[in-house]
């Protein structure tokens, strides 16, 4: 895993001073590394029945679509308000300075679907907790929340269901 971690570029003071941003575009842009990352993540779920993979806007779309393809599952998009064309349900959640809202189509799942939620990075866990809450009343089974990378020191996993979090790379 160290080889994949080393490809992720560190950008100091982005998006604001004091933050060391993990730029995953360097890994995504390297074909062999991207393929290896998708293979490693998907391998965890081979043999489990995954009906839908939920991709969280925006980089979660990349990870989610690749995993859905590898697992033979459908892809469901969770987006910011006003981006989905049909009837939606929404979840507003707190940020450090304000709130944000996510939406999902009301007909995104079939009853009893086994769902994997995918995103690029687990930081504080606020966004993923909102996604878990959003789908929790949709009569589906959450298999796991999976991430390409996690910033462990932010302890975002504590906001998510116990035993339902997997991160390939940990910083």
UniProtKB/Swiss-Prot annotation:
Pathway annotation: Purine metabolism; AMP biosynthesis via salvage pathway; AMP from adenine: step 1/1
Tell me which UniProt keywords the record has, alphabetically: Cytoplasm, Glycosyltransferase, Purine salvage, Transferase
Query: Catalyses which reaction?
Result: AMP + diphosphate = 5-phospho-alpha-D-ribose 1-diphosphate + adenine
Please name the top-level EC class of this enzyme. Answer: transferase
* Any GO BP annotation: adenine salvage
**Pfam families assigned to the protein according to its UniProt record, in alphabetical order:** Pribosyltran
EC number(s) from the headed UniProt entry: 2.4.2.7
Similarity section: Belongs to the purine/pyrimidine phosphoribosyltransferase family.
Function according to Swiss-Prot or TrEMBL:
Catalyzes a salvage reaction resulting in the formation of AMP, that is energically less costly than de novo synthesis.
| HAMAP family registered for this protein in UniProt | Aden_phosphoribosyltr
Descriptive protein name: Adenine phosphoribosyltransferase
Q: Which organism is it from?
A: Geobacter sp. (strain M21)
């Amino acid at each position: 895993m160290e080889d994949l971690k080393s490809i992720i570029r560190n950008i100091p003071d982005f998006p604001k001073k004091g933050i060391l941003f993990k730029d995953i575009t360097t890994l995504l842009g390297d074909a062999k590394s991207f393929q290896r990352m998708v293979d490693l993540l998907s391998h965890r779920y081979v043999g489990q029945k995954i009906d839908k993979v939920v991709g969280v806007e925006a980089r979660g779309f990349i990870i989610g679509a690749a995993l859905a393809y590898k697992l033979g599952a459908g892809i469901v998009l969770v987006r910011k308000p006003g981006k989905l064309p049909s009837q939606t349900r929404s979840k507003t959640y707190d940020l450090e300075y304000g709130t944000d809202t996510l939406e999902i189509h009301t007909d995104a799942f079939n009853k009893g679907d086994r769902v994997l939620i995918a995103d690029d990075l687990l930081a504080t866990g606020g966004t993923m907790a909102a996604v878990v809450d959003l789908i929790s009343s949709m009569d589906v089974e959450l298999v796991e929340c999976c991430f390409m990378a996690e910033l462990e020191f932010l302890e975002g996993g504590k906001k998510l269901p116990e035993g339902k979090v997997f991160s390939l790379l940990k910083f």
